[in-house]
A protein has these predicted regions:
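Active-site-proximal beta-alpha core segment in soluble small-molecule metabolic enzymes
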Residues: 2-182, 191, 212, 217, ...
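Aromatic side chains
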Residues: 2-3, 8, 117, 158, ...
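Anionic group-transfer/hydrolysis microenvironments
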Residues: 27, 73, 97-99, 147, ...
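Flexible glycine/acidic-rich beta-alpha junction loops that bind and position SAM and/or redox cofactors
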Residues: 101-104, 181-197, 227-239, 272-273
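Gly/Pro-rich active-site loop or hairpin
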Residues: 113, 196-199
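Short, electropositive alpha-helical surface patch
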Residues: 152-167, 198-207, 240-247
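Charged (often Lys/Glu-rich) extended helix/loop segments that serve as interaction or gating elements
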Residues: 208, 214, 222-376
Length: 376
């Protein structure tokens, strides 16, 4: 298992990953640096990304990264050159596009044909990539990788992806009289954001995928390869919440004579872009006190100069909410802090970890001095 660092990574989280003993997948030189700073064994690191720079590739090879997942013909050449220059044989996987329409938002669906990631099985570019890798003595092809998207519920798309990848493993065996030993089926397991949502448990997904892999390998007469998955959201998403302070409460009259209450908080799209980017939905609760007031239909909005800076479009909140109240938005651990920005020059909030009733800061709050630090 590899933890998908893009969901959320900092040095302390990297230390936890090291202590747990699982691997980690990173997709930039920056994420690689954090993983290494946290003491993760480079052999347990996978490097992803559709546009790795030469510098990132050379850093990965020099650091001893266990596997580089190749995403283009250019990249095959670049990794081969970097490995040869370092007098190493670099283990690689090929990222494949199995041509699957995962049922999720179009911005996080990654395995259909019209997408920037991977080599298409259907078009034949995957076979071209196989030939390219095999032409380099500095590369060792270990197997195939596919990631069909994010926030996916159910196993059908994952099982179909496994079926198509194993079909290509069989074709490889028939052509080259040898079997590739690894199959990485990515992540993307959905979590609960609202009451009533049913999350996908990675351990259960792994069992279902293992059964599908075994069945398809038996059909093709293949040995069962080592299977990997890459959960990120499913691990970190439910473990974190964002705590906002209410700044203003405003009632507005709409054109049809109805009213809408706007509750503005001290964050928004700079700490959680997902509602604006994907239309992601969340819930929230009053966190600093209890209230017996009647609920009022409200819109929770951020402090940024954007009409679209909406945290929750429609939510029932107590009628007596006032400035200074605290609102907790759960399930913000994935793609919140990791996609955060300094839009409007708003400093990013801290990250606080809680264990056994004790809290400690693991990423400090940014200051205005931090925002000015790189200016010349």
């Amino acid at each position: 298992m590899y933890y998908a660092a893009k969901a959320f990574i900092c040095t302390e989280v990297a230390r936890w990953i090291k202590d747990i003993g699982i691997g980690i997948d990173v997709c930039t030189g920056g994420e690689l640096s954090v993983a290494l700073a946290g003491g993760i064994d480079p052999a347990k690191i996978e490097l992803h990304g559709n546009n790795k720079s030469v510098a990132e590739i050379e850093k990965a090879v020099a650091s001893g990264v266990g596997t580089i997942v190749l995403d283009s013909l250019y990249e095959i050449e670049r990794v081969a050159v970097a490995a040869a220059k370092a007098n190493k044989v670099q283990r690689v996987l090929l990222r494949l596009t199995p041509g699957i329409e995962a049922h999720t938002h179009e911005s996080i669906a990654t395995a259909h044909e019209d997408v920037k990631f991977g080599f298409s099985i259907a078009s034949g570019s995957a076979w071209e990539a196989i030939a390219a890798v095999r032409s380099h003595s500095s590369l060792e092809l270990r197997g195939f990788h596919a990631h069909i998207g994010s926030q996916i519920f159910g196993y059908e798309s994952f099982e179909l992806s496994a079926e198509r990848l194993i079909g290509l493993l069989a074709k490889y065996r028939d052509e080259f009289k040898s079997e590739l030993p690894e199959l990485d089926l990515g992540g993307g397991y959905g979590i609960a954001y609202l009451p009533g949502d049913v999350a996908v448990v990675p351990a259960d997904a792994m069992k279902a995928l293992a059964a599908a892999v075994h069945s398809n390998c038996q059909t093709h007469g293949l040995k069962v390869p080592t299977i990997s998955i890459e959960p990120g959201r499913a691990i970190v998403g439910p473990t974190m919440f964002t705590l906002y302070e209410v700044g203003t409460v405003k009632d507005v009259t709409l054109e049809n004579g109805t009213h809408r209450r706007y509750v503005s908080v001290d964050g928004g799209m700079s700490d959680n872009l997902r509602p604006s980017l994907y239309g992601a939905v969340y819930t929230t609760v009053l966190a600093n006190r209890t209230s017996s007031a009647q609920n009022v239909s409200s819109r929770l909005v951020g402090k940024h100069c954007e009409t679209g800076d909406i945290v929750i479009r429609e939510i029932d909140l107590p009628d007596d909410i006032v400035p200074g109240d605290l609102l907790a938005v759960p399930a913000t651990g994935a793609y919140g802090r990791s996609m955060a920005s300094n839009y409007n020059h708003v400093p990013r909030p801290p990250v606080v970890a809680v264990k056994d009733g004790k809290a400690r800061v693991i990423v400090r709050r940014e200051s205005e001095a931090d925002l000015l630090r790189l200016d010349i």
